[in-house]
């Protein structure tokens, strides 16, 4: 799943447009679209996107033995 797909699913679930998400992040809609096109976000940006949508972004690893980091 791409970053764009994840954000589109999350904004759709919340009923928030990309323009509104950009506003909540303090970004222009053009910057958000550029970032969605490249798929390049820092962990901190994922956390901010989650907060802007009233969610918690989780980034980590899950190993075959069930260990999560």
Question: What positions do the PLM features span?
Answer:
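A short, Lys/Arg-rich alpha-helix, primarily the initiator
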Residues: 1-16, 20, 60
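Recognition helix of helix-turn-helix/homeodomain-like DNA-binding domains
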Residues: 26-41
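Short, basic-rich loop-to-helix N-cap that marks the start of a DNA-contacting helix
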Residues: 38-51
């Amino acid at each position: 799943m791409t970053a764009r797909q994840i954000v589109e699913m999350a904004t759709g679930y919340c009923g928030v447009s990309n323009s509104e998400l950009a506003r909540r992040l303090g970004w222009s809609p053009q910057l958000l679209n550029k970032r969605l096109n490249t798929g390049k976000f820092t962990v901190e940006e994922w956390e901010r996107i989650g907060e802007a949508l009233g969610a918690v972004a989780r980034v980590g690893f899950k190993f075959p033995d069930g260990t999560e980091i």
